Amino acid sequence: MNINGIPPTIGRRLAVQIASATVPGTQHVMPGRPNWKNNQDGLAVSSQPCGTTIAVVCDGCSAGERSEVGARLAAPMLVQILEEELAQRIVASRLHWPDIRNRLIHRLLTVATLMGRDLQQVIREYFLFTTIGFIVTPEDTMIFYIGDGVYIVNGIPTVLGPFEDNAPPYLMYAVTGSPVFDRDPSLAHFRLRRYRTSELKSVGVGCDGVEDLMKCSGRCFPGTNEVVGEIGQIFTPPFFENPDRLRRHLARMNRETAQGSRVEPGLLPDDTTLVIGNIGWV
């Protein structure tokens, strides 16, 4: 409230600055060794004129040979479904998440079925991934997730997981079945965190690779004496003014260097993908 008792956001428009980036982990590019696995993450972002912003990050299962396919399909699919839902309900807290989940599963199943092979095998190979995202509307902000990952609200990170046997829940286990869901059926559904947007300055979501990013604050960029610094720096203006700044920051952290005859990998062993937003009013 201001001195007149009027909320400071009344009569002002929500404005969310967005930055996003993804880099493959060193365990995927395997510096100095003749092997390669694709970046298995996917992300999608949508911003509307009213300021409403949606972001989704999907992290493909490392055991899936081509799980990046499902992750990169699911992220924009889920963003589109949320856009459709918000067009009817306006406020994020009124979204019906069981319907959203079922619609996403149905769309992914349509694609998987068209691939013309054993459906269970197709899902295991292509469509196992974790999901985390945020919705920012003028009224409220929702963090939503199935599986592990990291979300950051007003600079404070929250790590989701780890899960028993290092086996996070994947959305498409709803089709294949899994001991993960047998142990805890609630893991098959989106979990939610709600905030009043007027109380937020920043929000971010990322895959579990962001945990490694958080642990690197005291280390130096490979081949330099420059300290990486705290993760909070990515919410400062330079990372939003230059759309490539965040990607370059992650890429510098994962640059491989030569030490004599040995190749030293970068600092991020897992694929690292995140979307961050600074929240303001104009």
Placement of each model-derived feature along the sequence:
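Short helix/loop capping segments that flank catalytic or ligand/cofactor-binding pockets
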Residues: E65-S67, V153-G155, L213-C216
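Short hydrophobic beta-strand that contains or immediately precedes a catalytic carboxylate
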Residues: A55-C58, F144-I146, G204-G206
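Helix-loop-helix
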Residues: M77-V111, P222-R252
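C-terminal catalytic subdomain
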Residues: N2, R183-V282
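Catalytic core of PPM/PP2C metal-dependent serine/threonine phosphatase domains
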Residues: I90-I152, L187-T197, G260-P269, G277
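N-terminal entry segment of metal-dependent catalytic domains or homologous docking segments
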Residues: M1-Q80, G149, D182, G266-V275
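PP2C/PPM family metal-dependent serine/threonine protein phosphatase catalytic domain
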Residues: S20-K37, L109-V122, V153-S198, R252-G260
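Short Gly/aromatic-enriched secondary-structure transition segments
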Residues: V69-L73, T158-V159, G218-N225
